[in-house]
């Protein structure tokens, strides 16, 4: 199987299905990445340990601090105690919260992170009244990447009216 085909199948698997953890699996949050395809994670109970990334995810899926994973325990591991079995994206997290499979300790963390991101990405503009509630959750741009290395230019309505009049 070529590298492109492998990548296509791995990405399709990660983005496509909604997985519920089994009895042995755990939902964990990534704290840091010390390297060599190892990630330090924290469970809902506060236990910290290392997890390894299987070779099918390497160079295909990137994991960053704050992401959530489903891991399988490794019995013989001393430092590395689990292996990543699934990477959870925001849609998976919402689905697990709705189904009641999400740990309470992480629900507080996700709400706090969402509030922090909204404060960072939303410029402080005067509040405008909402239009007739036609906006759906699919139009929510709060999870889009914002490049912080670029200046944010905000054009006011007064400036645009002056330009149109000239």
Swiss-Prot record:
Intracellular or extracellular location(s): Nucleus
Modified residues (Phosphoserine): 132, 136-138, 156, 160
Modified-residue entries (Phosphothreonine), positions: 33
Any GO MF annotation of the entry: RNA binding
Basic and acidic residues bias (residue ranges): 110-119
Cited PANTHER family: RNA-BINDING PROTEIN EIF1AD-RELATED, TRANSLATION INITIATION FACTOR-RELATED
Name listed for the protein in its UniProt record: Probable RNA-binding protein EIF1AD
Lineage summary: Eukaryota, Metazoa, Chordata, Craniata, Vertebrata
